[in-house]
Amino acid sequence: MMERIIEKTDDGSATLFVPELNEHYHSTKGARTESQHIFIDMGLKASSATTPRILEIGFGTGLNAWLTLEEAERSRRNILYTGLELYPLEWQTIEQLGYISVSYTHLTLPTKRI
């Protein structure tokens, strides 16, 4: 398993750095800013589908999924979301990234390993 180091980005949100690949999961200029702009503002909000279907290959940190959940609740829109990840993160790492707000800790999210 590859080492992953949590780093703060310029907007204050966290991302992961993989030294073996010399690669970050998100832009170091802002993980949340990048995901919000690309995935939500230019993707989800631009869709006219009543119930959008999203397939994310390379689920990564789950930030795109998290922002999608927030937008779905804000817009009262149903979204069918599937995320695939070959190397899923440990729950402890997800918690340390700090994306999940206290108001959502009641959620039980389904997972299935294939």
Which positions does each model-derived feature cover?
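Short, glycine/acidic-enriched loop or turn micro-motifs at the edges of active sites
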Residues: 59, 88, 111
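Rossmann-like AdoMet
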Residues: 1-52, 69-103
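Acidic active-site catalytic centers that drive phospho-/nucleotidyl reactions
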Residues: 56, 85, 108
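Conserved small/polar residues in nucleotide/adenosyl-binding loops
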Residues: 105-111
